A protein has these predicted regions:
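Beta1/beta-strand and adjacent pyrophosphate-binding region of the FAD-binding site
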Residues: 2-14, 32
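Short hydrophobic core segments
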Residues: 9-11, 194-207, 378
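Active-site substrate-recognition segment that forms the wall
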Residues: 22-23, 51, 81-82, 204-332
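Glycine-rich FAD pyrophosphate-binding loop
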Residues: 26-45
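Dinucleotide-binding Rossmann-like beta1-alpha1 core, especially the glycine-rich loop
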Residues: 48-125
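Helix-loop-beta segment of a Rossmann-like dinucleotide-binding subdomain
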Residues: 81-89, 123-163, 303, 358-366
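Helical element adjacent to the flavin cofactor pocket in flavoenzyme catalytic cores
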Residues: 139-187, 195, 199
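C-terminal catalytic lobe of FAD-dependent flavoproteins
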Residues: 278, 287-292, 298-387
């Protein structure tokens, strides 16, 4: 059975694939998006929902800034859960203070709005932060947060409402994708269902076994497993926006690339075990007043993804809770759920791209910056695909 022809077929229903579909639709293309699961269940819905261009470097910062405007413009038309409460990085010692001052100097040269907060200002704005932790902070008022478990569904609902030339099919794992004539043919269910398109873009998340497994096995991609937790709703806690902490200043690429002191600062002894497990502490208060806490990072190469396991390490969760309790004055152990998320990344590339020919394009392994950078990156990617 062959269905109608589309200008673009997007394989993958996560944030990267969905924004590829969105920008193609804006360009007037007919788009079919195919998602293998009942609905998106991967990294797009298992994260903090923090959109933080301030943590990015080079063109990825630009993609993030463009993404802020895209999210905000869509929110004006349709509620996709965007809240504009800014991002704050809290320094807990002198080295971290040096880093935030150096980052401010960098962003001042770009004209990207930022503000330094002293301890009193931090405690006034974020009364849940412990005074002993908060030495100084850098605040980015224009940055946003979304509800990760809601946003992708709302975005796809918006696209279905706005664009008549958009089709979205769940429960549609693509098992074949090949060149056919001047376009591409995509197959489902042992090719009993076929779709044809002018072009296909594959945004496959951490699914590397259904399409082009040999290509991915040699790609150098690694998969990161992260652990996160959510508290019960805490209406009396005020912690708006994206809360990033001292460990984040020692990890994010913007600090690494733009802060001259980054390479010379020493890791305090109390951070050693945390760094071993790739832990840095973030908080994001959800719309229901529950608070997401995380996260950790352990890795396996793409050929040994299953070695990461589906279990949660109690030791890692305990390390995160102990550090979180050092930062905030509410009971971080009032948890309602904990989970593991997975995302692919590459050790030397910001994203993995393959143009198999002029019709079949792979865009994957965007790493931990999908929520921040996908909207802006996909705009440029679609221009290139259709150029």
């Amino acid at each position: 059975m062959t269905n109608k022809h589309f200008d673009l077929i997007v394989v993958g229903g996560g944030i990267l694939g969905t924004f590829h579909a969105y920008h193609a639709l804006l360009a007037g293309k007919t788009v079919l998006q195919l998602e293998k699961d009942n609905y998106p269940v991967g990294a797009t819905v298992r994260n903090f929902g923090q959109v933080v261009p301030s943590g990015m470097e080079a063109e990825w910062f630009e993609y993030g800034v463009a993404g802020l405007e895209i999210y905000k413009s869509i929110q004006q038309e349709f509620d996709i859960s965007v809240r504009n409460n800014g991002s704050v990085y809290i320094a807990s010692d002198a080295d971290e203070q040096t880093l935030i001052h150096e980052l401010k100097a960098h962003y001042d040269t770009l004209g990207y709005e930022t503000e330094l907060l002293g301890q009193a200002a931090i405690l006034n704005k974020y009364p849940a932060i412990k005074p002993a932790y908060a030495k100084e902070a850098i605040f980015f008022p224009q940055e946003i947060s979304v509800e990760p478990e809601l946003m992708i569904h709302r975005l796809q609902q918006y696209m279905q409402t706005k664009f008549k030339n958009y089709q979205l099919h769940y429960n549609s794992p693509v098992t074949a994708c090949q060149r056919k004539g001047n376009g591409v043919e995509v197959g489902l269910k042992n090719n009993s269902v076929l779709f044809t398109g002018g072009k296909a873009v594959i945004c496959n998340g951490y699914e590397f076994k259904l399409l082009y497994p040999e290509l991915f096995s040699e790609s150098g991609i690694v998969v990161s497993k992260l652990q996160m937790m959510r508290t019960v709703p805490m209406a009396d806690v005020k912690l708006s926006g994206n809360i990033l902490t001292g460990l984040t200043t020692r990890r994010y690429e913007s600090f690494e690339h733009y802060c001259p002191s980054f390479q010379s600062i020493k890791t305090p002894e109390h951070y050693e075990e945390l760094k071993k497990w790739g832990i840095h502490i973030l908080f994001k208060q959800a719309a229901d007043n529950s608070i997401i806490i995380g996260d950790s990072h352990v890795y396996a190469d793409v050929n040994h993804f299953d070695d990461l396991g589906f279990d949660l390490s109690h030791h890692i969760n305990e390390l995160m809770l102990e550090e979180a309790a050092r930062i905030v004055d509410f009971d971080v152990r009032k948890l309602q759920t904990t989970w593991a998320g997975f995302y692919p990344q590459h050790p030397t590339k910001h994203i993995v791209t393959y143009d198999l020919d002029d019709c079949i394009h792979i865009r994957t392994a965007i790493g931990g910056k999908g929520m921040t950078a996908s909207a802006g990156y996909a705009a440029e990617s679609i221009k290139n695909i259709f150029s």
